[in-house]
């Protein structure tokens, strides 16, 4: 049986080519994603390990601000350094000055990076990293000396177009440097690697202290390097014992883990997100495999019947088909692994082009990736091939020797019953999630219901699709005559095969149109929210979320035509000191609280003052807080207790559940910077946009936007996310189109004698090609119609489920619906090119004689 299976496999290797290619694409997707994820994780772990000392001295609670991606003004005084240097376990102590939001402008005046990875500034230091690792070193040039010299990391200098000796333009959200320092050094890691897209500008220590610490003789942190034989834990114990109250020491490993933790969690989420789409691609691939082996098994029914008649058992026949599937999966997995490496290189290049510079990072091919590639490809192939293999074993040998072997009707009935059962379970699940408020995790109920409905429609598609196939066949017969009639009859000849092929396309288009509705509705909801809640006439903010100098707001307030400015500032704390319960905070001046138009449901907005807070109603209810209670929160300066003076209705004008005063936030260790400013204009003011822009013309990271520009800025991330998802779904659609090509190509082989007879009675090559194209169009249109219908239902359902998240307006993009349907027709025609050409080129006599 093994020899027979291998001979059968070699004899039909061309027929298995497209199925193998489908597995190749699915496995490549999985491999590429896992390789990229491992590469990113390894690079960031190595980066953070190289940017901490053996022991790190910092202000207590300084990590609170870091968790919220905000800047703290807390520092460690330089006077601590001599005491630390006298410790028996300390080899050296280095003071580090570090600040975020320090942007390098390119030679063309554009900000380098900043759209994702941070932009750092600080003092140059050649201290070794923890465990003796080498940190940044000067690769070319020399260290900076004086206020007119700067060192840039290698990637930043390259992206900005600077060479040694050039004058460098550097800005922050608060100021443009008065001097244009000369680039005197290029820094990097001697053993390769990079800052992964972050930018770094280093000055000498006095200059960095003047620029980033207001001239204080202090540092952001100290790095303490351990002597030989002293562990990080031993050194940190010595350091902690020597520190006064208000400062703490942590091991370099712990500091690196704190910095890398949130980022690695995000990478883990991204990996899971991408693997979901890889799973979709593999599911679509499985449809192709089921169809391929169903057709091949049907073509080999006589051969397998003879084997049964010669003594082969039912299990042996099934195992022979499974052996062929194993071989297909093995070849597909091997090729997919190789293509996955290429795909990972492409992902790395794409990500590097948008800011996360990984071009210098070697790709990581971990053993688990290789195992996942082969396990995924082989298991998916063998599971998909098991159904037709099992079906073969159910047909009696004598029956299989006949020419008219047919699938038992009981199989179709079972699929219908399964489909009805899934629909009967899925619809109530979705309804419970949508309308029963007491049920926890409503979104999971809706998601489970949607998935069950999708699987139910797929299972019942042979029955659901029959009326559509008949109707389409009638239309084609009327429009294209005999060839249209034949195409319709061929589609109905094996409705399960036709609908299975269409289901692969249906899944891709269902997801694509669901995403289209979610994206269109999200943008419509954003527009509505901006339209309903945009107060004032202009908003001022940093393009990268950094704070900016209040002097900018002061200058704008003095412009003729500006009647008022409303400032907001952002902070971050830990609720009750719990590291897992972060809390974002918004602050404004008490005298401007009326401009927020907040509606109190308890207490009074007029009681808003320093060391008090207003809470949003839903958040207050969730945390059992009310007027008169105390909100305990840990901030960079320590634990604080704020009195709750009001509970207000939800308002999109306040970007946090907690609102306090500007002075309260300033006293909590956050910088004196505005984050978001609303400008109110005199109704008769003209040319105000230009005058506001003039205030920030030297600060390209701070922008002034009217309502229309602000709405466009809010929509931009949605467009980017939708574009990424479409790109990921493209793989599934490509595989589905390959499925149509595969089914038609195998169908042509299966119907070789029939095609020969058609040619013998006068059907021309052109008519034959037309017939195959029409069959392909039927499959594509069926998949598109089901996909669009389900996409609309799922999209509207999910939007309704997300109504409490601010997505209040449902928008169905009709133009995209039409485009999807037209593209389906085009894909159907293109998918038929190869099979139709093959059918038209068959030799008539050989085709008639074919068995």
Question: Model-found features: residue ranges?
Answer:
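Hydrophobic alpha-helical bundles that form the membrane domains of multi-pass transporters
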Residues: 3, 8, 12-29, 37, ...
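Alpha-helical transmembrane segments, especially those used as permease/efflux helices
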Residues: 11, 15-17, 269-272, 368, ...
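Alpha-helical transmembrane segments
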Residues: 27-58, 63, 294, 344-352, ...
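Small-residue-rich transmembrane alpha-helices
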Residues: 326-357, 369-394, 423-436, 463-473, ...
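Juxtamembrane segments of multi-pass membrane proteins
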Residues: 447, 451, 457, 463-619, ...
